[in-house]
Amino acid sequence: MAEVEETLKRLQSQKGVQGIIVVNTEGIPIKSTMDNPTTTQYANLMHNFILKARSTVREIDPQNDLTFLRIRSKKNEIMVAPDKDYFLIVIQNPTE
């Protein structure tokens, strides 16, 4: 667990990072650097989005899988690294 904490600290120290959320495969936040309402909102919305993106990738090619997802808007950028047991979600300001 110390390794996970170290990784989260390293990510959080990067310029522009607004928050980090670790979500289990059911969409339940395990760890977060954001407040509860924001964490819940991102966890719920991104969980559904990640599952749909993963399904789309597999539908195009059943031998393939989603390895990284990046969404960029005017206000922020959301990066997701899915794993078999959890999803790592990083929200950052793309202009910083």
Curated annotation (Swiss-Prot):
Listed Gene3D superfamilies: Dynein light chain 2a, cytoplasmic
Alphabetic keyword roster: Acetylation, Cytoplasm, Cytoskeleton, Dynein, Microtubule, Motor protein, Transport
N-acetylalanine carried by residues: 2
Recorded superkingdom: Eukaryota
Biological processes, Gene Ontology terms: microtubule-based movement; visual behavior
Principal cellular location given in the protein's record: cytoplasm
Molecular function GO labels: identical protein binding
Location in or out of the cell: Cytoplasm, Cytoskeleton
Any one GO cellular component localisation term in the record: centrosome
Subunit structure: Homodimer. The cytoplasmic dynein 1 complex consists of two catalytic heavy chains (HCs) and a number of non-catalytic subunits presented by intermediate chains (ICs), light intermediate chains (LICs) and light chains (LCs); the composition seems to vary in respect to the IC, LIC and LC composition. The heavy chain homodimer serves as a scaffold for the probable homodimeric assembly of the respective non-catalytic subunits. The ICs and LICs bind directly to the HC dimer and the LCs assemble on the IC dimer. Interacts with DYNLRB2. Interacts with DYNC1I1 and DYNC1I2.
Role: Acts as one of several non-catalytic accessory components of the cytoplasmic dynein 1 complex that are thought to be involved in linking dynein to cargos and to adapter proteins that regulate dynein function. Cytoplasmic dynein 1 acts as a motor for the intracellular retrograde motility of vesicles and organelles along microtubules.
Protein family per UniProt: Belongs to the GAMAD family.
Name the UniProt record assigns to this protein: Dynein light chain roadblock-type 1
Organism this protein belongs to: Mus musculus
